[in-house]
Design a protein with these regions (language model features):
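Short, glycine-/small-residue-rich phosphate/pyrophosphate-handling segment
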Residues: 87-140
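N-terminal beta1-alpha1-beta2 submodule of the flavodoxin-like/Rossmannoid cofactor-binding fold
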Residues: 1-85, 139, 147-178
């Protein structure tokens, strides 16, 4: 999903997507993962937020809420909140769940709450996007979503369209605001 959203962002010549992931959270107090992943995209650091002009965050859904690694990351952003570093910047959210009733909308809303506290300008996907009318899997007006199922199904055509539309929308808002 992040790659498809990034494709939407990158379609704007004035914007460049910076895709990041987060390490897992462990009850073990010793380091359980390398500081830099051996493969894939780099881990996000709160310092990445200082340079962003717009922010799109995503998380799998667990019991209708964002995953612990994202919550842990967002809980470390108090210095950015105190300085107002993210005020007025556009933001959006996306999620994937394993079941149709996996709480996609509540997961999306849970990710929005810290962004509201940061003073970010939250945007979803408008109903002018055909994918919202055609999908029978994911995509909501609250943000992009994916119904992965138990077998980890690939993104549907409509989910890809919604992801790219969300990226394009945030890129356009970022350009308009800057």
């Amino acid at each position: 999903m992040a790659e498809q959203i990034g494709t939407g962002v990158d379609s704007n010549p004035d914007c460049e997507a910076m895709v990041r992931c987060l390490p897992g959270v462990s009850a073990n107090t010793e380091q359980t993962q390398a500081a830099i992943p051996e493969q894939g995209v780099p881990f996000a650091e709160t310092s990445d937020l200082e340079d962003c002009q717009g922010l799109i965050i995503g998380s799998p859904g667990y019991f209708g809420n964002m995953a612990a690694p994202l919550k842990y990351f967002l809980d470390q952003t108090s210095p950015h909140w105190l300085s107002g570093a993210l005020i007025g910047k556009p933001a959006a959210v996306f999620t994937s769940t394993s079941s149709m009733h996996g709480g996609q909308e509540s997961v999306l809303l849970s990710m929005m709450l810290p962004l509201f506290h940061h003073g970010m300008l939250i945007s979803g996907i408008p109903y002018s996007e055909a994918a919202l009318h055609q999908t029978n899997t994911g995509a909501t007006p609250y943000g992009a979503s994916h119904l992965a199922g138990r077998q980890g199904q690939p993104l549907s055509k409509d989910e890809i369209s919604a992801c790219q539309a969300l990226g394009k929308r945030i890129a356009a808002l970022t350009t308009q605001l800057n």
